[in-house]
Amino acid sequence: MPQTNPFHSLVPRKMTDTELARSIRLNIEAELDAINLYAAHIDATDNEDAKAILQHVMDEEREHAALFWELIARLDPEQAAHAKEAVEKYRLITSGASHEAVEAVGKEGAAPSPADVTPEKRLTVGSLRR
């Protein structure tokens, strides 16, 4: 009869928040890998029952990844600050702000002026060629 030691994974000490954040990042990686794997399986079959089950499980993995990301934001305030800056940079980029305005996000005393975000500066196929 196979035996498993229920204590085999216990460590002799508790992790610090920094160590836990590193571990949670690996968990996020595993969740994203699972999402990609399930999406590939969905694309590779015509079996509707399998697709439904895979979609359900994939949605759960998406939720897990999101929950882990929220945990990282609490465990690593520096990464949380970068994430907040990224949201602002995304808003500026997609509204056509200048490169300088985007790069100024997070810098001391730098705030994009309203002139940096105008309808005329919206990205178009033509503007990307320049």
Curated annotation (Swiss-Prot):
It comes from the Bacteria. Transmembrane segments: none annotated. It holds the Pfam family EncFtn-like. Residues 123-130 are annotated as: Probable targeting peptide. Fe cation 1 binds at E31, E61, H64. Its main location: other. Keywords: Encapsulin nanocompartment, Iron, Iron storage, Metal-binding. Fe cation 2 binds at E31, E61, H64. The encapsulin and a cargo construct (an encB-encC-encD fusion) can be overexpressed in E.coli and in human HEK293T cells. In HEK293T in the presence of 0.5 M ferrous ammonium sulfate nanocompartments can be detected and used as cell markers. Coexpression of this nanocompartment with a larger nanocompartment from Q.thermotolerans (AC A0A0F5HPP7) allows of expression of different sized iron-rich particles. The encapsulin shell proteins are not seen to mix. InterPro entries: Encapsulin_nc, EncFtn-like, Ferritin-like_SF. Cargo protein of a type 1 encapsulin nanocompartment. May help nucleate Fe atoms in the interior of the encapsulin nanocompartment. Present in about 92 copies/encapsulin nanocompartment. This is Encapsulin nanocompartment cargo protein EncC. It comes from Myxococcus xanthus (strain DK1622). The gene is encC.
